[in-house]
């Protein structure tokens, strides 16, 4: 009988844990949907820019570069330039 009493004592905690888990899963699912919608919007903007004659690859590169820290970007550009000079590309 002690076992059944212990199970009854755990039921509210178990229900809380189940509700909390369900809430977490639903939040993740909602965020995944939002992420997909944003991804679709970004793809549409790139398609629009391509339709207007812009080079999408260059745009993606610029977006990636703008995300970088200016010092890190400068360092990467210096290294790239050094390598290109060593290969006689510039």
From Swiss-Prot:
This is UPF0335 protein bsl7135. Coiled coil: none annotated. Belongs to the UPF0335 family. One of its GO terms (molecular function) is DNA binding.
